[in-house]
From Swiss-Prot:
Gene3D superfamilies: Glycogen Phosphorylase B (3.40.50.2000). UDP-alpha-D-glucose binds at G22, G23, R263, K268, F340, L366, V367, A368, K369, E370. NCBIfam families: PRK10117.1 (NF007513), trehalose_OtsA (TIGR02400). The lineage of its organism: Bacteria, Pseudomonadati, Pseudomonadota, Gammaproteobacteria, Pseudomonadales. InterPro entries: Glyco_trans_20, Trehalose_OtsA. Its EC number is 2.4.1.15. One of its GO terms (molecular function) is alpha,alpha-trehalose-phosphate synthase (UDP-forming) activity. Disulfide bonds: none annotated. Pathway: Glycan biosynthesis; trehalose biosynthesis. Keywords: Glycosyltransferase, Transferase. It comes from Pseudomonas savastanoi (Pseudomonas syringae pv. savastanoi). This is Trehalose-6-phosphate synthase. D-glucose 6-phosphate binds at R10, Y77, D131, R301.
Length: 474
């Protein structure tokens, strides 16, 4: 049985709490436990890159991690992955800060990681690479003679040609991506955007619906929307409330709660969301004193100016809205710039009447799925969801909105707050059915199954050699 090798920018620690944060870690650990194998990635620490890999083995899984130098971390991670690729892939070219040394550092670190992984690989390993930090990784492995099956999963959106092709190094990135055997995307729109970018640059031959050749390299493209653990989330949400939360729930028994949580990021549409809530207060005054909107947005990348700017903007907007509409005994908007335990958030989801998830652009958005999974099926809340979140392709029974249209979002909030129990139950049941069928294990099993079906490049070349060899004529 082939071993699975997973490569990601960061690895979850090899302990019993590794998957407690949910998301990617749960899926990866599930795949590794099924096949046995290796999880390879950055340790999260800076230091001497020449030090031996730190290896930990538990059961049939080995964790191998490495340090990065301060310069490599800054150029590869901060300056290129997060200051070029992240804003560009989220359609924010105005925030891209391209610097040639950062591009060189990005390529250098991908080459370094390939050098470190190479001695650990076995001939029949199946290799699964994750996310935008490692776009050139298969190319570096191929340069080193690796013919194993290599798959790639992009967790963020893939932009259309007019966005992607504005990157100074777009052509190199596209050609290097074709060194993967299988390219996975969150949505069909992302998959088609990649193929459009490729077709604008070179001739792409499509052998079947999702099998292609470019620059003489054969690869497949497919859609793999990442899922969650709905049963585990429901279990966490239904457990007893901590004393403080129980007291708050009692105090707010006559107040309808609108709730949002995500890390502080310009892609999440938080300023637009605040303005939409203000439009709700302005156009639907019957809700005054009867609703409360709580926004949790812990700081991420706090040293980056764009993130500092949005934090200050939100603080100012929250103060302005509360000053304009607040009353004695009623604060309409609570903005909390701090981290909360994930299990506690699931309980808060369960007692929120509306889940408000309106990113301007998002690969999937697992918060939307978690909100649905956390609800009481007999008395569920309503999900208001951006059309630009990947989850909108699956959760079609949510109230789908354009986050740039504050009046539309306000109208959806009013509808959610006044929706009948029967309609809430019906919409929730339809979404929960999708989430249960397409859970995190289904996601990883589909990807691994498709990757296993691909013929390794070494076998492909042998087949071509046989076809091209003719007996010598007498």
């Amino acid at each position: 049985m082939s071993r699975l090798v997973v490569v990601s920018n960061r690895i979850a620690p090899p302990d019993e709490h590794a998957a407690s944060a949910g998301g990617l870690a749960v899926g990866i650990l599930g795949a590794l436990k099924a096949a046995g194998g290796l999880w390879f990635g950055w340790s999260g620490e800076t230091g001497n890159e020449d030090q031996p890999l730190k290896k930990v083995k538990k059961g049939n899984i080995t964790w191998a991690s490495f340090n990065l130098s301060e310069q490599d971390l800054d150029e590869y991670y901060n300056q290129f992955s997060n200051a070029v690729l992240w804003p560009a892939f989220h359609y924010r070219l105005d925030l891209v800060q391209f610097q040639r040394p950062a591009w060189d550092g990005y390529l250098r670190v991908n080459a370094l990681l390939a050098d470190k992984l190479l001695p650990l690989l076995q001939d029949d390993d199946i290799i699964w690479i994750h996310d935008y930090h490692l776009l050139p990784f298969a190319h570096e492995l191929r340069k080193r003679g690796v013919n194993n099956r290599i798959g790639f999963l992009l967790h963020i959106p893939f932009p259309t040609p007019e966005i992607f092709n504005a990157l100074p190094t777009y052509d190199t990135l596209l050609e290097q991506l074709c060194d993967y055997d299988l390219l996975g995307f969150q949505t069909e729109n992302d998959r088609l955007a990649f193929l459009d970018c490729l077709s604008n640059l070179t001739r792409v031959t499509t052998r079947s619906a999702k099998s292609h050749t470019a620059w003489g390299k054969a690869f497949r493209t497919e859609v793999y929307p990442i899922g969650i653990e709905p049963k585990e989330i429901a279990k966490q949400a239904a457990g007893p409330l901590p004393p403080k939360l129980a007291q708050l729930k009692a105090e707010l028994k006559n107040v309808q709660n609108i709730f949002s949580v995500e890390r502080l990021d310009y892609s999440k549409g938080l300023p637009e969301r605040f303005l939409a809530y203000e439009a709700l207060l302005e156009k639907y005054p019957q809700h005054h004193g009867k609703i409360r909107y709580t926004q949790i947005a812990p700081t991420s990348r706090g040293d980056v100016q764009a993130y500092q700017d949005i934090r200050h903007q939100l603080e100012n907007e929250a103060g302005r809205i509360n000053g304009k509409y607040g009353q004695l005994g009623w604060t309409p908007l609570y903005y909390l710039n701090q981290h909360f335990d994930r299990k506690l958030l699931m309980k808060i989801f369960r007692y929120s009447d509306v889940g408000l998830v309106t990113p301007l652009r998002d690969g999937m958005n697992l918060v939307a799925k978690e909100y649905v999974a956390a609800q009481d099926p007999a008395n569920p809340g309503v999900l208001v969801l951006s059309q630009f979140a990947g989850a909108a392709n699956e959760l079609t029974s949510a109230l789908i909105v354009n986050p740039y249209d504050r009046d539309e979002v306000a109208a959806a909030l009013d509808r959610a707050l006044t929706m009948s129990l029967a309609e809430r139950i019906s919409r929730h049941a339809e979404m929960l059915d999708v989430i249960v069928k397409n859970d995190i294990n289904h996601w990883q099993e589909c990807f691994i199954s498709d990757l296993k079906q691909i013929v390794p490049r070494s076998a492909e070349s042998q087949q071509r050699d046989k076809v091209a060899t003719f007996p010598k004529l007498a």
